[in-house]
Amino acid sequence: LPLRLLQIPIRRDLLAQAVFDSLTVHKLVEMRHIYQPGCICLPEQAMNEIMTQLYRRGLTVVSNRRGYGLYYTKGDTLQFLELQADNDHCADLLLQAAREKTGAQNARILLAENQTLYLGAGRRCGYGMIAFLGRPFPTTDAYFRMLL
């Protein structure tokens, strides 16, 4: 599926709460099936290896009972590889909690075109991390977006 790239400022909310880096791979797979029922998932052992590689590269997971997000911090911007939530308000709460943790004021979010979060916002872009990174990348590394 094509992707939508959304760049937005993150409003400050000192009361936004979420937990960080506590989402197990088993729970991540469960949540993916809830939010993206048609997604293709690797076996749990392979997902463990991919998540380990991503954590080593600085990935952070923000989650609460209404959604989750996987992101890297780059300067003043949180770059979300994946954001899934019950609705826009729940997604905003995840963004705000991540802002309070990192101090970053902006978000760059990749959404699957069929996701209903921030419907109609953002611009359409090609599939995969090529659009996300904006530069060549080694194809021997884990390619996380292929899993959605």
Which residues make up each language-model segment?
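Active-site/acyl-donor-binding loops of N-acyltransferases
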Residues: 1-14, 84-88, 96-148
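Amide-forming acyltransferase catalytic core, primarily the GNAT-like/NAT-type
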Residues: 2-82
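Sequence-level detector for tyrosine residue identity
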Residues: 35, 55, 68-72, 89, ...
